[in-house]
Amino acid sequence: MRATLEAGGKEARAQLPLLLACSFAASFAQSMMNIALPQVADEFGVTLSTANWLVTGYMVVAATSIALAAFLLRRLGLRTVFFIGCGALALGSGLALFAPNFWVLLAGRLVQAVCTGLFYSAVTSFIMANSDPARRGTHLALNSGTVAAGLAVSPVVSGLVLTGFGRHALFALPLALAVLLLAVGFFRLREVGPRGTGAVDPLSVVLGLGALVYGLGEVFRDPLPSLAVLAAGVAVLGLFAWRQLVLKDPLLNLRPLGNLGFAVGELLVMLGMMASFSLSILLPLYYEGALGFSAFLAGALLAGPVLANALSDVVGGRLLDRWGIWPLVPCGFALTALGLAVVALAAGRPLLALVVLASAVAYVGLGLVVAPSKTTALSQLPPSLYAHASSINSAFIQIASAIGSSLFVGVLSADVLAGTSRGLARAAAYDAGFAHTMEIAIGIAAASLLVSLAYAYRLRRRRG
């Protein structure tokens, strides 16, 4: 009989802290390079959009790993997946630690990303399978809080290490985390639940979003070749979706997307995550490139707004239970648009305190959007589709983050190159590029507000 996390399930309950530590390591590794892009670009003589592959490439691989995690858990079990994830984090961190050039550094980041994709999916699956239904929401919220803590702590700690000890030392942190997790997991982690059967489709693993993300990142700098790559990426993405629909045992079951309520809810989640992860990259670029701050100070200025986002996630869940999606999610997008608009105005002055405060407002708005939109989207489906829909949501979050950061950093990189070629000082070019990207982000937030108003109003009318 399968153990649960409640009374009588001591073995499963004892493993939860270890798995939460895995979630922390996964989120820490994911966001650790957000504050390092300017330094990496300068060190290796590459553009910002190229350096941003350390972030976008990571998210593409993580999205693929999320889709693959369900198969690996079913065939190999939790303990084996844990060791694969920790091994990927250790190997990728070791490669990046001693990387002599940008491409070895990128390879290390892509290997690291396997850890994030596997752990995000594995920990959620463990909680869903081994929690008493009355406590499942609490355990999932605890996991979400752990992930948010990693996202908030990573820029500060990484910035401190990067400023004080340099780029190589930055990867000693996730390497140490991986070694510690491997040691504890070897003695403490036990298999929970039976293994299943099934096969994975290799072509589905190969088909990915790389061409699409690359095209978005470079299209403003080199339009014609990038548009061709972008078109190829869209075609490959379409082929991936078609293959999942025709396979008997798909890598990622896309059938829940046939439900319009779920599909629109996921669209709102993706739009929110594009804004959230783009802010977490664009703000450090502004602080370091336009204002000349150190990586540590840039990370410290980002920590408060990210923590505000984590707290608003919890508040948003409670407000959703009480009021539903109306008017919560539209208000969240309105706050986001307002915060981004004030950031753009204050950054041009520059008024640092107002930039930080306004970015916190935008992050709070996003906290009222993402989790409620996800919960509402899932509620449109029958319980038999929850597992597939959760995998879609996790993969879409990584995809949206990759597309958003690639688009915005691509625009900023093109503006910086164009500005410096016209004789602008580097800081002035960063400032102008940041203002341009904020205009695009505000437009996306405003369009999202309109979509959320129509979606929330439709659901409200359906309830009568």
Give residue ranges: language-model regions.
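Transmembrane alpha-helical segments of integral membrane proteins
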Residues: 185, 417-422
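Short, Lys/Arg-rich, polar N-terminal cytosolic tail immediately upstream
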Residues: 1-9
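Short, charged juxtamembrane terminal tails flanking transmembrane helices
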Residues: 3, 461-464
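Membrane-embedded alpha-helical core segments of multi-pass
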Residues: 65, 118-119, 144, 150-154, ...
